[in-house]
Each structure stands twice: as C-alpha cells, then as structure tokens.
Amino acid sequence: RRKELPPACLSSELRSPQMRDIQKLIPAEAIVYGRLPLMITENCLVQNETGCHLSEAGDAVPQQAPCRKPNDLQDRTGAKFPLLPAYGHRTEIQNSAPVWLADKPEWKHCGLTYARLRFTTEAPAECADIFRAYQTGAPASGPFTRGLYYRGVD
C-alpha cells in the first residue's frame, strides 16, 4: 500500500524546469513570495550588540528577548537585511528584498502542489495586500528580487 508524502518545499535555487521534474516524483511547494534566508550565524548578532544574556533560557529564544524586536544589518549601499532569531540563540539573516513572482505566470505551470508566501517582517495588513496581489497577478509595489528562479545556480 502506497502512503502519501507531505509536500516538500523546493530549494529557491531551482529553475522552473527543475521544479517541474521534481514534482513528478513527490508533491512539491515553492516559496513564491518572501525574504529568503541568506545565512544563519553561530552566535546571536543582537546579543553581541546589546549584551542580552539568555543563558538561563536554554536554546529557545524567549518572547521578550531583544532579538525578537525588529533588527537589521545595513550594508554600504544602505540595503537593510532583517535579522530573525533562530533556535540555539543564533541569527537568521534575511535578504534585503523579498522574492516577488505574482506577476510571473510561469511558476503556476510548474505543477506545484502549493505556493508558499513566506511572511517574516510584514505587518498583518501588508500580508493581506500581498495575498490579494498574488490572487490578481499584480506587479510589485516596492523593491523585490526574482531570486534564482530564472537564473539558477551554476
């Protein structure tokens, strides 16, 4: 008897034809909106800056920790990279611009089981606006990236 597998979230480094090939084997989803993680640091960057001491809290990040507040890194061009708390009191550095594919119909023809909208730093009203934009295929209203969906990785 064959069991159903839950959908796997595909790598954002895959191009559309590669996604189409994988979905033939397993149910698949892809992130079609959101800030993608660039790296996870071994240490909490906010702790290094503010000196928050959470050793008594263990590996989980408490709700009131300074790293739960909006923090970012800024590069020399002024781009801001949001910092999200990660398990083990690490930091997940997000891309400065979200992936935006609402106005690109190609992802709808890859055979994906689901399309994931990855909300990380957005306010609730902004999440609703983005959801509606994806329903209508609207272009982005701010800075965005297409990720690697069209370029891929060598």
Where are these regions (language model features)?
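Active-site pocket-lining/capping segments in soluble small-molecule metabolic enzymes
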Residues: 1-154
